Regions:
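Intracellular alpha-helical coupling/juxtamembrane segments of multi-pass membrane proteins
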Residues: 259-292, 296-302, 306-313
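ABC ATP-binding cassette signature C-motif
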Residues: 1-272, 316, 323-563
Length: 563
């Protein structure tokens, strides 16, 4: 359908949704969407973002108010846990997105075969009907570039790093299923594209490709995401969900940040912690690139200053306060000629790096490249095939993994954190356990939830809270930014900036990486790992000079060569 920026294609009139009596998740929302608009939805976890998408998609029927669609528009929806047919292969599922094109090609070939049959070529009326239908199909095929369908599918699957096309869907991980579902949906090209956390399980290169694709997308895009660069590059509107209300803001994320800060200044007599955090993020946004680079270099030389900062002052300033742990010596962790393979798949070979005492190292690269394996090797949970990791004598590691296996599902959030003690000893001071949990967005009621019923984002926040209270001086954080709302991300960034120690963070969140990292350890494909001193943006510039501007490809491995 042709773009029409004056055409309202969808409206919500007085929409409210409550999961419990007197507890509205969405409250009396009035919204209208124009064709071609790009809208990013933000808000705390539990604020109703996914529920709003489900209402628009027609999957959530139990609500008050009215939802009105203009006739003739199609809707496509990417759920956080999409349904895929387990009896099919990856390619068969992806091809569902182009089924009308496949049907047109199939019918075109059938018509060509009919031309050779006597019952058709001996009957002029039937031949005329075939020629007419063939012309109609030819128009469809030409308009959709259907003759190049296989190469288009291959490019899309490569760009999103989908698994091999012949792999059974039943064998895919959760992240692989999402990438396949996203690929199918983008090929489908609905008029309204509803995306629930589209950047989850995508690496930075695939996210960059997705951004460019959506910037050029003719239809309306409505995305729930915590990826602030995605919101900056794609969104023309921000819809903030706050205590049930839907507040629209014109502009991208940086524009929202500026408008939101001004509004909070007018509403608050004294500046809250959250407002100060927003103001500091806005200050970073306004910085010139060279000033940002200088900040990263200054951090590397400020270990003693950070270590000696007054704990009480830091705790009062920060929403998430990370205790420093014991003083680090000059030797932190050093990789010496490390190699690791699974079977004949070489993850990395001759890996060398030295972690700085006050550095924040961002670990980036495609899923399956070996990032989590690196952490498991450092922790001694797996063995290297060659080389060694040397760990300094003063190092005390706090490790946050993706599996969260050490969370007891039968205990409440409060019980897991407190261990039965009302006060936690952190940074040489007593900290109230409930107050500590509230910093990770666990309110009073949420603190009593059993861990077995927590969402992915809640488990991530809980595990982060568990690890950060251990007072390590080296933090290994595996995807701490997954399923975490923007407010918690912002608070975590500030906590890490003020942490006197070394942090190594696996993340695909480019804004997060850009704001806090002093170094980047990049898994670049073909078993190559590149260690770079500088911010994420500086690394990207360096990579462009070294490797050129290529579209993302699926992960490929070299074979392990034995002596």
């Amino acid at each position: 359908m042709a773009a029409d920026d004056k055409k309202i294609i969808f409206s919500m009139v007085g929409v409210s949704k409550a999961f419990q009596p007197n507890k509205n998740v969405l409250k009396d929302i009035y919204l209208s969407f124009f064709y071609g608009a790009k809208i990013g939805i933000i808000g705390l976890n539990g604020s109703g973002k996914s529920t709003l998408l489900k209402i628009i998609a027609g999957l959530e029927k139990s609500y008050q108010g009215e939802v009105v669609f203009s006739p003739g528009y199609s809707v496509g929806y990417l759920a956080q846990e999409p349904y895929l047919d387990n009896t099919k292969t990856v390619k068969e599922v992806v091809m569902e997105g182009v089924q009308p094109i496949v049907d047109a090609l199939t019918e075109y070939e059938e018509i060509n075969q009919k031309f050779a049959l006597p019952e058709y070529y001996e009957d002029q009326d039937k031949m005329d009907a075939l020629f007419t239908r063939q012309g109609e199909l030819q128009d469809i095929i030409d308009a959709t570039d259907a003759w190049n369908l296989d190469s288009k599918l291959e490019r899309a699957m490569d760009a999103l790093r989908c698994p091999p096309e012949d792999q059974p869907v039943a064998n895919l991980s959760g992240g692989e299923r999402r990438r396949v579902a996203l690929c199918r949906l983008l090929l489908q090209k609905p008029d309204i594209l509803l995306l629930d956390e589209p950047t989850n399980h995508l690496d930075a290169e695939s996210i960059d490709w997705l951004e460019q694709h959506l910037q050029q997308y003719e239809g309306t895009v409505i995305a729930v995401t915590h990826d602030r660069y995605f919101l900056d590059h794609v969104a023309g509107w921000i819809l903030e969900l706050d205590r049930g209300e839907g507040i629209p803001w014109k502009g991208n994320y940086s524009s929202w940040l500026e408008q939101k800060t001004k509004r909070m200044e007018m509403e608050e007599k004294t500046a809250s912690k959250r407002r100060k955090t927003l103001e500091r993020e806005l200050e970073w946004v306004r910085m010139a690139p060279k000033a940002r680079q200088a900040m990263g270099k200054a951090r590397l030389n400020s270990y003693d200053k950070l270590l000696n900062e007054d704990v009480k002052e830091k705790e009062e300033k920060l929403e998430i306060f990370i205790p420093n742990g014991p003083r680090l010596g000059n030797k932190v962790i050093e990789a010496k000629h490390v190699a690791k393979a699974y079977g004949d798949k070489l993850l990395f070979d001759d890996l060398n790096f030295m972690l700085p005492p006050n550095g924040i190292v961002g670990v980036i690269g495609p899923n399956g490249a070996g990032k989590t394996t690196l952490f498991r090797l450092i922790m001694g949970l797996e063995s290297v095939d060659k080389g060694e990791f040397e760990v300094g004598e003063t190092v005390k590691v706090a490790y946050v993994d993706q599996q969260h296996k050490d969370i007891d599902p039968n205990k409440s959030v409060y019980q897991v954190i407190s261990g039965g003690n009302e006060l936690l000893r952190m940074g040489g001071r007593d900290v109230n356990a409930r107050a500590y949990l509230s910093r990770f967005n666990f309110s009073g009621a949420d603190q009593e939830k059993l861990c077995g019923v927590l969402s992915g984002g809640e488990r991530n926040r809980l595990h982060l809270a568990m690890a950060l209270k251990e007072e390590g001086n080296v933090l290994l954080l595996d995807e701490p930014t997954n399923d975490i709302d923007v407010n918690t991300l912002r608070a975590l960034e500030e906590g890490l900036e003020d942490f006197a120690g070394c942090a190594v963070v696996i993340s695909h969140d480019r804004w997060f990486l850009d704001r806090i990292c002093t170094h980047i350890l990049a898994f670049e494909g073909d078993s190559n790992v590149f260690y770079f001193e500088g911010s994420y943006s500086e690394y990207e510039e360096n990579k462009l000079k070294r490797l050129g501007n290529e579209e993302p490809k699926r992960v490929r491995y070299r074979k392990l060569m034995t002596d």
